């Protein structure tokens, strides 16, 4: 599968939409825009091709679902009742776009050296990032949006699965509600986990649909955490960062873990077992 074949495959799957496809050969991207208002999304084809080698049709299904929902929500809808809206925070990499294609700046807050907090209008099956222009429609200030989002993220259930590797404990939150990584902002929950830790607590948000917490009790744990975050980072539809964060009473500090030349620590079976555990938890 190459980028041209992927382009054609996506166009065939999405031909029922009232959209226009724009292929950029140099950037290897496919932009899909609504015909009525020219709003749309851009897909990086080379990244999807890489994921296709392992995930096959699953990644195609996910991309098509994402595009269909995004295009549907980009209609010029009118928000009539602010009491009915749900605003949530979402975590993005610092390299993520700072403004819309129309030039409207997104409402955002600096979070760490690796991450920023954006704010989203929850639309049920998807959400729309809030920009400064939308604030007028919502009749809200940026500060009100931030306060509402933090209040709402604290109400989310923080159900997790656990696994132990060489004496180190790993916690996984993977509800696929779009806000798994956002739970990193629930300081009360993170402090609760820290009180259970016997070693150093690390936190990972490799992509938007997973939050990894770790109780690192020996050197092997650092290497496993580094592998985990990189593994999830490469598989996520919305990757954030492959780095981990040290956590202590509300403070997050990005750390870079140097892998050791130790086959036992780098055993791929460990990563596969943790991934299988996560998938089992998802089904439950």
Swiss-Prot record:
Pfam families named in the record: DUF1444
InterPro entries with a match to the protein in the record: DUF1444
Protein family membership: Belongs to the UPF0354 family.
Protein name: UPF0354 protein SERP1303
Protein source organism: Staphylococcus epidermidis (strain ATCC 35984 / DSM 28319 / BCRC 17069 / CCUG 31568 / BM 3577 / RP62A)
Organism lineage string: Bacteria, Bacillati, Bacillota, Bacilli, Bacillales
